[in-house]
Amino acid sequence: MTSDLSPSRGAAPHAAPLGAVARVEEAQLLEAALLSGAHVLLEGPPGTGKSTLLRQVAHNREIPFVLVEGNAELTPARLIGHFDPALVLERGYAAEIFEDGPLLEAMRTGGLLYVEELNRIPEETLNVLLAAMSEKEIAVPRLGRVVAASGFGLVAAMNPFDAVGTARVSSALYDRTCRISMGYQSAAAERDIVTLHSPDIDDAWRAKVVALVRASREHDALEWGSAVRGAIDIARIAVELAQLRGVAVDDWHVGLAAAEVSLSGRIRLHDSTGRSPEDVVREMYERIFGPEPTDDSADDADSAGSPGEP
């Protein structure tokens, strides 16, 4: 890749400012790697801003951006493209009836191919990517040789800690990429991220929501916890649920309900735990937000907030 990153069709959409998600250094490293012609592997758990990082870099430099989700169904044909079967019967294997897949679209436009969940891709599909990365060209049967336009690059992302439905990434791929490790952001950065999505909620309550999500990453019963997306959803759901119930956003029961629905599917329990996700979420919630208020404590709070009888 050269430093010619001129705009073309399919420019990346706008994303959150990188300063707001504490990824300025990673953005500089990614941009420098792409400008140098290197391909990049972003490694980190879900919700650490890998997609946001790439989208913002691509948006800022107006680089064409093609997204493909890695999974077991991503065959070489789906990645490269195919001839339209109906038109083949009429016109034969003419180049103009070939429908580009995401790889050829990125190569022809000199854009970035962003591959999510790289370690879920079948080996034969991964070999196609390796060839395109190494040679900046591929040979397509009945279509011929496709050479990548200036600016083409591949950025892949994966969660190296997820062992379910994934395969070990070969050393050949690591040898062809520069690796940027992306861990969880600081508590302050995560509070800023939640603020972007729910700016009107109380700062102290928002801080507790972030503390709850961060606690899930260290709980002994959990194999892994939630990323900041869980905190974003807790805040959003609590706002709507409080309106439906006619109570304050920081109502204890509203917060618990929002936390259970937002986190129970994001956390993963150890097989030997013998507990439900909701049970663990409630335990953490009570530790951060305090025990469930009783009717007496609610009455005391109401009395404290009202003038007494003379």
Model-identified regions with their sequence ranges:
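Short acidic/histidine-centered micro-motifs embedded in hydrophobic/aromatic stretches
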Residues: A132, L212, A258
